[in-house]
Amino acid sequence: MDLGIEVILKLFSKNGLENLFQVASFKFIEFGENSQRIISLQQDYIKTIDSVIAFLQGKNPTLARQICSGNFLPEASRFDQLDDSSENLNWAFGSMGMQDKAKHLATLYLEDLSDFIVECVDENFGFSRYAERLGRSANSFDEMYAHLQSDLTYIDKITLQILEEKLKSINPKLVCISVPFPGNLYSAFRCAQFIKKHFPEIKVSMGGGFPNTELRDLKDKRVFEFFDFITLDDGELPVELLNSNVQIPNSNEFKRTFLIENNEVVYKNNTIRHDYKQAEVGTPDYFDLLLDKYISVIEIANPMHSLWSDGRWNKLTMAHGCYWGKCTFCDISLDYIKVYEPIAARILIDRMEELIAKTGENGFHFVDEAAPPALMREVALEILKRNLTVTWWTNIRFEKNFTADLCILLKASGCIAVSGGLEVASDRLLELIKKGVTVEQVAKVTRNFTESGIMVHAYLMYGYPTQTVQETVDSMEMVRQMFEIGILQSGFWHQFAMTAHSPVGMFPKEFGVVPEMNEITFANNDIQFKDKTGINHDKFSFGLKKSLFNYMHGICFDYDLQDWFDFKIPKTKVSPDFIENSLLEDNSFVVKSSAKIVWIGGKPIVEYFTKSKKGSSWEMAKLTFHDKRQMFDISLEKDKALWLVEILEKNAVQNDKKMTFGQIKEDFEQRFEDFELFWFSKSIEILKENGLLSL
C-alpha cells in the first residue's frame, strides 16, 4: 500500500477539510492574514475540494474550463504570483494547453491549503515529505526519538487510522516499510511505533534509499524499539530471507541486515546465497496500489518539470548501477552505483508489455542513474520492432555516443525527454569531477536531442570544492547561452553537498575541503564542510535560480549577469558565441564501418521512367515515400534504385539483423562503382533526413 496517497485523499476531501477546519478553530493561536483568509473561505474550499481532486485524478476533465475562467477556486497567497497579468499565465501555458493551466491553478489551490495546515494544524506537513528536517543527516537519533515520544499530530492520527484498518484486514506477519527519502523517515518510525504497540506479534522491517545511504553506520539500539530489521541495498533476497525467518523462526539466515542480538546492534550477512540477477527479479507489481486515484499536479509552468508530478509513470530500470561510476560527488562506493548490471532489451520490453497489460498505462520512467546509450538504442529498436506505442523518459550522461541519428531513433520509439548532469558547466571542474564530458560536448548532445524533438533537462551545480567566483559566473553564462540558442528546455541549480560515500567525502583533503565530523550512531550521509577557498557560495543561490527561471520561460537573455545579484560579480570571460561556435562542426561525412544502418520509414512506391540526354537514354526509378507528416520522393538509376529498395527492406527496423555500413559498402561495390559518391549524394541525404539512420 502507499500510505502517502491514501493520507492525502482522506485529508483533501469534503469530510477531511470539514474536520481540518474544525480542529484549526480550536487552536488558541493568532493566525496570520493568509490563514485568516482561508478560514473565511472555508465553505468555498469544502464545496470545491472533491471536484478539484477528481479533476487532478483525470476523472473530471471538463472542470478545466471552469477553473480557467476564474472565480471558481478560492484564492489565497499562492495565487499572488499570478497578479501581474492574466496574459502572463496564458503565455506561460501557451505550449501546454488549458488542462495544464487548470492543473497549475488547482495545484496553487492545494498549496494554499498546505500553507494553512503548516501554520494552523501541523508544522511538519508537506505533500511529498513530512518532518523532513528530522531525517536530514541526523548523526544522532536523539531528536527523532524525543519527537516520537510526543503526542500524535493531526496527520499522524490520519495515517495511523488508515494503517490500522489495513493491518486488521490483512493480518500480516511481516510489514516492510520503504523509506526512500528523509521526508519519509519520521512517518515510517510512527507507523512502526504504532505496530509495535498495538500489534506486537508483527515483525517490522525498513529498507529503501534512505537506509541504503544513511544508515550504514547504525549503532543506536533505540532504533530497534521500532524496527526488528533494517536491510541495505537490493531488497529481493534480504526480504525473502526475512520472510523465511518469520515463517521459520530458527532459520537465522540474513542478507545485509541490521538487527538486535544479545541487546547489541549487529549486522548480519551470513547467507551463502547471491543476490538475484536483474534478469531474474521480475516485473514490478502495482496490483494493490490505487493507480486511478493518484493526483497529477503542475507546480510551475515548465513542460519538463511537469513530468515529475503530472501523471503516473510505470517505473523500470535499464541497468542496475552506473556504467560510468567515476563522478567524484556521487556515492560511487555504494552498490546501487558501483554494481553495474544491464538488462537485455528483450527482457525490458517484455516487462513493459506486462506492465501495460496490468496497469493500462503505457508511460514509462526509466529511473537509471545513467541509462547506457547502447542499451537505449537496443530498447528503442525492440520497441519499434514490436510496434509498441509507449511514452518514456530517463536519466543520461551527455556523452558523445548520443549522435543525431541515435536521438532520432529514440524519439521514434517514444522517448520524450532526458535529464542529465551539466553540473558546474566548467571544463576544469568537469575534469576534477571526472564527469567525462566537456561543455562543448554537452552542447552538441543537447542539440541532437532537441532537434529530434526530445526535451532536455540539465542538473546544474555550484559550490563544488575549489570553484571560484569567476567560474560560477562563467558557468552561468554557459547556461544562459544554451537556453538562448534553444538546446536546453529545463534545468535546476543545486548547491554541492558532500556525502559520506562519495570520493569527496571519503578523501576530502584531495579536494581542498575540511569536513566537520561528528560521532555517528544513526544517520550518516551529508557532511558539513569548509572549503579552503573561503567563498560563501550560498549567496549565489537566489540569482542563479531566478535567472534560470526566466531563461526557462525564454526571456531576459539580454540582461547583464550582474542584474541577477545584489552584490558585485566579475564580468564573464566566456565568449558570447562560445556555445554557437561549439555547434558548427559538421560530422555528416564520418560514418564508422561498424555502424548499424537502420531504416525506420515505410516501403516506397516504385515508378519507372526513361531519361534522355544528348541522344542517350536510360531507365530511372522514382521512389515515393509517405511518412506521418509528409510525402517525399527521390529518383535514381533503375538498378541502383532497386538495390536501395532491397537494402531498405533488409535494414527495416522490424528485422532482427541489420547490415553494417561496411557490409552495405561492400555489397554496393560488388555491383557498382563510387559508393561514397552514391551514399553522400543529395538523394540519399534526403533519406537520411527522413529515417535512414547510422547507429
PLM region spans:
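Active-site cores of enzymes that catalyze phosphoryl transfer or operate on phosphate-rich substrates
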Residues: 112-162, 299, 303-332, 336
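Flexible loop/turn segments at secondary-structure boundaries
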Residues: 6-10, 182-186, 212-214, 239, ...
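N-terminal [4Fe-4S]-dependent radical SAM core
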Residues: 144, 264-315, 630-633, 689, ...
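Glycine-rich beta-alpha loop elements in corrinoid/cobalamin-binding modules
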Residues: 1-82, 89, 106-109, 132-277
